[in-house]
């Protein structure tokens, strides 16, 4: 609250709470009711609340984060203080036309009404005392759910625990949000009756009825006796002793074929290329076949 509030331009004795744009006058609640209810023309004057910070100028915007009406100067000073305040959402102030009483203030009238007329500040997440939610889904048709299972051929070897009939009560949403402790009975909205003889729907497939068992698939560690370990070490040492580091030819036929192939500058070449590089008279006798001589 500012140290010195602006006085009403009409009575000069009470702090002004709003500003009339048509009359360009700062008025208190009593004077506003007297002036703007005198005739129909005066009732159409636009009025806005004063700034809630300085209380010296008409409000220009409404800050949704602070829920406060601010003038141009206070809006600039407050929302330029730090980066967090710069992200506050502000909307232009909405003028009103109804006369207000002396008890009504700007903080009580700051509301964020969307285009559909819904009150955003009255959040549905905040519960008020005395509110009782009775059957939120009363407009929907919920048939009774009956979950049953059939015993398999082996008797009582069912995998799924038997919870057979689930009936939804109509009034299971009757709970008081203002209660300090939620009783355990508030959650007993499902009437469960366990019966293994009134079973209609099989929970376990009839073909096979195989139960899934969790087995340990890890490979067990091989435990060797000292004698077995000593034998393995000896075999390894014998193999290492007989190792030969000489060059071995794996494919002798490939090596022989590679030695027979013609080469040009160390690279394999086709036989036609080798004939041209031999300097033979290929141009004259190129079209004639070579007759082998015996």
UniProtKB/Swiss-Prot annotation:
CCT domain segment(s): 229-271
ZnF endpoints (B box-type): 8-50, 51-93
GO molecular function, one term: zinc ion binding
CDD domains linked to this entry: Bbox1_BBX-like
PROSITE patterns membership: CCT (PS51017), ZF_BBOX (PS50119)
UniProt xrefs under InterPro entries: CCT_domain (IPR010402), CONSTANS-like (IPR045281), CONSTANS-like_Bbox1 (IPR049808), Znf_B-box (IPR000315)
Gene Ontology process terms (BP): red light signaling pathway; regulation of flower development; regulation of photomorphogenesis
GO cellular component, one term: nucleus
Positions with a binding annotation for Zn(2+) 1: 8, 11, 31, 36
Pfam families, per database record: CCT, zf-B_box
Residues where Zn(2+) 2 binds: 51, 54, 74, 79
Chief place where the protein resides: nucleus
Family the UniProt entry places it in: Belongs to the CONSTANS family.
Name of the featured protein: Zinc finger protein CONSTANS-LIKE 3
Species name: Arabidopsis thaliana
Gene name in the database record: COL3
């Amino acid at each position: 609250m500012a140290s010195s509030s602006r006085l009403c331009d009409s009575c000069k004795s009470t702090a002004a709470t709003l500003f009339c744009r048509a009359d360009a006058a700062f008025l208190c609640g009593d004077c506003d009711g007297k002036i703007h209810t005198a005739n129909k023309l005066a009732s159409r004057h636009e009025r806005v609340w004063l700034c809630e910070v300085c209380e010296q100028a008409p409000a220009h915007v409404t800050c949704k984060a602070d829920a406060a009406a601010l003038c141009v100067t206070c809006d600039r000073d407050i929302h330029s203080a730090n980066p967090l305040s710069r992200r506050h959402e502000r909307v232009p102030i909405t003028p009103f036309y109804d006369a207000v009483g002396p008890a009504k203030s700007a903080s009580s009238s700051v509301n964020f009404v969307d285009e559909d007329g819904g009150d955003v500040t009255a959040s549905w997440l905040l519960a008020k005392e005395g509110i009782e939610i009775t059957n939120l889904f009363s407009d929907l048709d919920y048939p009774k759910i009956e979950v049953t299972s059939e015993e398999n051929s082996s008797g009582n070897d069912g995998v799924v625990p038997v919870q057979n009939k689930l009936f939804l009560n109509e009034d299971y949403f009757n709970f008081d949000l203002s209660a300090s402790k939620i009783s355990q009975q508030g959650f007993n909205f499902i009437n469960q009756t366990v019966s293994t003889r009134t079973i209609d729907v099989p929970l376990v497939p009839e073909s096979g009825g195989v139960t899934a068992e969790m087995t340990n698939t890890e490979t067990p560690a091989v435990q060797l006796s000292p004698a077995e370990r000593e034998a393995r070490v000896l075999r390894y040492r014998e193999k290492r002793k007989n190792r030969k580091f000489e060059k071995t030819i794996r494919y002798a036929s490939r090596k022989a074929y590679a030695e027979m192939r013609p080469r040009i500058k160390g690279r394999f070449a086709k036989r036609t290329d080798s004939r041209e590089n031999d300097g033979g008279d290929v141009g004259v006798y190129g079209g004639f076949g070579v007759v082998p001589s015996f």
